Amino acid sequence: MNYLDFESKIKEIEDKITSLSHVFEDEKTEVEIKKLSKKRLELMESTYSKLTDWQVVQLSRHPDRPYFKDLLPLIFTDFQELHGDRTFGDDLAVIGGLAKLNNKPVMVIGQEKGRDTKSKIKHNFGMMHPEGYRKALRLMKLAEKFNMPVVTFIDTPGAYPGIKAEERGQSEAIARNLLEMSALKVPVVCIVIGEGCSGGALGIGVGDRLLMLQYSYFATISPEGCASILHKTAEKASEVTQMMNITSGRLKELKIVDEVIPEPLGGAHRDYETTATNIRKAVAAELKILSEMTVEQRNSRRYDKLMSFGRFKEA
């Protein structure tokens, strides 16, 4: 397992437990392991109860954190992937298709970063091209046609900023998704499972309900990007994070996020199954409520929610 810098003391105890577990078992060893396990639990509860916002960002990027492809088979059944935007190509930074949630059909769409070097390159580190947003929209429109709820999983450092992406209309593709998602006639639930950064996240993040895993973040810019603008150096990222209000708890207080999904003690990477179960229960509960509303009721609430964000004046 990989450890973050603030987890060094936890690592020391877990290394001791692992070392002792390989020793011939006797009563003395068993007692020592129990003592260390209790100490580890107390230390973890203390550590994770007072995380800084920057530490939450670090957890959201943990190399062992479950990605969309890890969670997909644990939450849904009968997944059938659908490919391509029918205009340019098939962007593998986003995966989508038909699936069942508790035996009910849904359209599931998620950003995938990739685990190792080969898969990271394949999925472009979760940074979608315009054809990715158009593929996602095509699947949403298909879901609308067949009256299926849409569930999206957000985990991206941002939309791909390359020249080719700009030439193919990156900003238009994202803007089009914002427009179309705000008016979809089926329930839409969006979940931030790791990084939810900039327009790259918004492009599949407009819906009736926005949920976040406990140790994820949702921001208009990464902490490093913000620090580079304000302080001319990314090294100030940990400082600016505190004033950005980008963690799940802070965004829940600001009413940007509707629900925070709890993670296992120590983060989602320590227990994929429990994380997936928590997500499945949360999404199922939201869809049950939304499915009992009429299209007019849902869209009216969605509109009111979107219009409540921020303030502006006409000059």
Curated annotation (Swiss-Prot):
It is an enzyme of class 2 (transferase). Its main location: cytoplasm. Belongs to the AccA family. Its EC number is 2.1.3.15. It comes from the Bacteria. It is found in: Cytoplasm. InterPro entries: Acetyl_CoA_COase_a_su, ClpP/crotonase-like_dom_sf, COA_CT_C. It comes from Francisella tularensis subsp. tularensis (strain SCHU S4 / Schu 4). SUPFAM superfamilies: ClpP/crotonase (SSF52096). It catalyses: N(6)-carboxybiotinyl-L-lysyl-[protein] + acetyl-CoA = N(6)-biotinyl-L-lysyl-[protein] + malonyl-CoA. Acetyl-CoA carboxylase is a heterohexamer composed of biotin carboxyl carrier protein (AccB), biotin carboxylase (AccC) and two subunits each of ACCase subunit alpha (AccA) and ACCase subunit beta (AccD). One of its GO terms (cellular component) is acetyl-CoA carboxylase complex. Pathway: Lipid metabolism; malonyl-CoA biosynthesis; malonyl-CoA from acetyl-CoA: step 1/1. This is Acetyl-coenzyme A carboxylase carboxyl transferase subunit alpha. GO terms for biological process: fatty acid biosynthetic process; malonyl-CoA biosynthetic process. Gene3D superfamilies: 2-enoyl-CoA Hydratase, Chain A, domain 1.
